Amino acid sequence: MAVVLQNNVLFSGTILQNLRWGNENATLEECQEACRLACADEFVQRFEDSYNTYIEQGGTNVSGGQKQRLCIARALLKKPKILILDDSTSAVDTATDASIQQSFEERIPDTTKIIISQRISSVQNADRIIVLNDGVVDGFDTHEKLLKTNAIYQTIHETQTKGKEEA
């Protein structure tokens, strides 16, 4: 099992060293593949030293979204049967979040993913969605059924898609 939290930790050392906290025996190619799945490879390749780029303690020299994607890649290197993502894409834009979700569906379909998110777009393709209201389960179903039956889910969906439909 691997867990990626919203507030994640990077250590002082290279990107490659940080990734290998997930699997100390991971090859460069495995690290690159995990980064591709987490939509991190592209920005890592833009650094002058690529995977040998030094990360400051706490990851202060990368953005919040970059930090989250590196931590997702690190978790993927564990090759977990269960992957828990606790609001772990909150600092990335919705397009990147969608790309990460799509790569999970296509490349790691047999991994059980538990996704905790405030973004409906992050969970809408899940087999089942749990809607919580003040810590109490208010709904449990598919995206389509919750849109028809759950007022809280409907309101959140409407709020999050309103700007997209007007654009």
Please report, for each region that a protein language model flagged, where it lies by residue:
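ABC ATPase nucleotide-binding domain signature
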Residues: 1-9, 23, 58-59, 120
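ABC ATPase nucleotide-binding domain helical subdomain, centered on the C-loop/LSGGQ "ABC signature"
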Residues: 16-57, 101, 110
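C-terminal portion of ABC ATPase nucleotide-binding domains
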Residues: 37, 46, 50, 102, ...
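ABC-fold ATPase nucleotide-binding domain signature/coupling loops
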Residues: 41-70, 85-88, 92-95, 162-167
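Hydrophobic anchor residue at the start of the ABC signature
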Residues: 72, 116
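A short, proline-enriched helix->beta-strand linker immediately N-terminal to the Walker B motif
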Residues: 77-81, 110
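Conserved D-loop/post-Walker B switch-helix segment of ABC ATPase nucleotide-binding domains
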Residues: 93-103
